[in-house]
């Protein structure tokens, strides 16, 4: 699927193909880990999970943007950096939630650094009409990280989700805001406690990104 559609104008909601592939791998891991697995197989999953995380963190947005028009390359690089930070946070949080990745200080520090970078990048991207529609999922991921006591980050996520709803006239950002606020007040911190059922946090069914390329 990725090889067939990855270079098309509707390319996975603006996701760099390698990062989108890693999201698919993470979701497959989550499905496998929900089954009763022998300890040795669980250890293998942990090793593979670290490989995925290392690959995400080694992704180069600058190289990805090189194939784009020079006039839009800076925006593509910004989008790639946002996706990279959000996917790294998703990888850690969602795999810790099912005990594939451990709850250790090193990964907590990684989440802190990725979230700080993601917040800085979102401040730059959300005002840009060409990137705005791609920002809902990264904001949701940042909101999950904000459960760890960062009230200023929670306020930022609330504000920007409300802005997205006003900019677009869509309800999805407000739905995300409600979900996150319930999570922040729940006393829980794991990824799966945030989402009691599946949600599709996208702004539109398919965004034509051909005018950015």
Positions of predicted regions on the chain:
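Cytosolic regulatory protein-protein interaction regions
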Residues: 1-166
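Intrinsically disordered, low-complexity regulatory regions with latent secondary structure
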Residues: 159-213
């Amino acid at each position: 699927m990725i090889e067939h559609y990855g270079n098309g104008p509707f390319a996975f909601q603006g996701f760099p193909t390698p990062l989108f592939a890693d999201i698919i791998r993470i979701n497959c891991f989550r499905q496998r880990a929900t089954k009763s697995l022998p300890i040795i197989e669980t250890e293998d999953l942990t090793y593979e999970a670290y490989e995925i995380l290392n690959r995400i963190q080694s992704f180069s947005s600058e190289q990805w943007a090189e194939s784009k028009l020079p006039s839009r390359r800076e925006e593509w690089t910004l989008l790639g950096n946002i996706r990279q930070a959000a996917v790294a946070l998703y990888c850690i949080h969602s795999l810790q939630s099912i005990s594939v990745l451990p709850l250790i200080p090193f990964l907590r520090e990684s989440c802190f650094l990725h979230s700080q970078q993601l917040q800085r990048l979102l401040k730059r991207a959300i005002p840009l009409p060409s990137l705005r529609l791609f920002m809902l999922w990264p904001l949701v991921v940042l909101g999950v990280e904000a459960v760890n006591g960062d009230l200023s980050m929670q306020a930022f996520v609330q504000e920007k989700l409300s802005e997205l709803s006003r900019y677009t006239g869509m309800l999805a950002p407000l739905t995300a805001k409600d979900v996150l606020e319930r999570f922040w007040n729940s006393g829980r911190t794991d990824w799966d406690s945030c989402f009691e059922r599946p949600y599709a946090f996208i702004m539109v069914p398919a965004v034509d990104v051909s005018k950015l390329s």
